[in-house]
């Protein structure tokens, strides 16, 4: 299973490079803009007191950092809330969201996960941002860009923090990074491929 998932992830990455080239060297000459020009907003998660165990059924729960750390969305990585009444709708995760780990170990900080499907009543912790793009960029394009191997040093370069064990990325620093911004029609070419890939991936995970 793991091997199949790795192969599918490699296929996603290869398609991105095929369409857009190296996002740092930018051999195709795409426009380069600050990320802030492509974002409508960045939403914060929230800090909760929760159980150490995963939820049962649709009981409200908070995602663990590992739900968005490895490039794909893992809703089963969650911790149940202590009380159902603690649920906060504004930080619930929805289909189509792009999650970004703002705090993590230095090598894993600033990874992104796109939400193709999600069970209800799962919420973002305060260690995760939701990146909401505007009409200039698709969330799927930004997801693949952030996790692109050549682009990782840019993300890691804006992380800070005194502790060697944990790095942190602020909204302001994130908004100021420079990104390639191909025409939206080009960006959308990724979507057909990736949605098919992710469906087959979900079947293998069941």
Residue ranges of model-derived segments:
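A short glycine-rich beta-alpha junction/loop motif
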Residues: 121-129, 137, 160-188
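Non-catalytic DNA-recognition/assembly elements of restriction-modification systems
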Residues: 7-46, 176, 181-206
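A short beta-sheet element
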Residues: 64-65, 88-147
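Short coil/turn segments at secondary-structure boundaries
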Residues: 28-31, 48-55, 158-159
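Contiguous mid-protein beta-loop-alpha structural module that forms a pocket-lining wall or clamp
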Residues: 2-5
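Sequence-specific dsDNA recognition surfaces
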Residues: 36-52, 66-98
């Amino acid at each position: 299973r793991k091997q199949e998932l790795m192969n599918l992830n490699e296929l996603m990455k290869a398609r991105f490079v095929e369409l857009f080239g190296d996002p740092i060297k930018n051999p195709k000459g795409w426009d380069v803009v600050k990320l802030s020009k492509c974002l409508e907003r960045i939403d914060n998660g929230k800090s909760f007191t929760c159980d150490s165990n995963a939820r049962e059924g649709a009981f409200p729960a908070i995602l663990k950092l590992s739900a968005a750390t490895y490039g794909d969305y893992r809703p089963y990585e969650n911790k149940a809330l202590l009380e159902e009444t603690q649920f906060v709708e504004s930080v619930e995760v929805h289909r189509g969201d792009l999650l970004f780990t703002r705090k993590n170990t230095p090598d894993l900080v600033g990874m992104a996960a796109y939400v193709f499907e999600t069970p209800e009543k799962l919420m973002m912790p305060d260690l995760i941002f939701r990146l909401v793009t505007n009409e200039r960029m698709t969330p799927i394009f930004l997801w693949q860009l952030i996790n692109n191997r050549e682009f990782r040093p840019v993300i890691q370069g804006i992380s800070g923090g005194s502790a060697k064990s944990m790095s942190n990325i602020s909204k302001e620093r994130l908004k100021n990074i420079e990104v390639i911004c191909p025409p939206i029609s080009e960006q959308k070419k990724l979507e057909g491929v990736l949605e098919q890939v992710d469906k087959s991936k979900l079947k293998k995970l069941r």
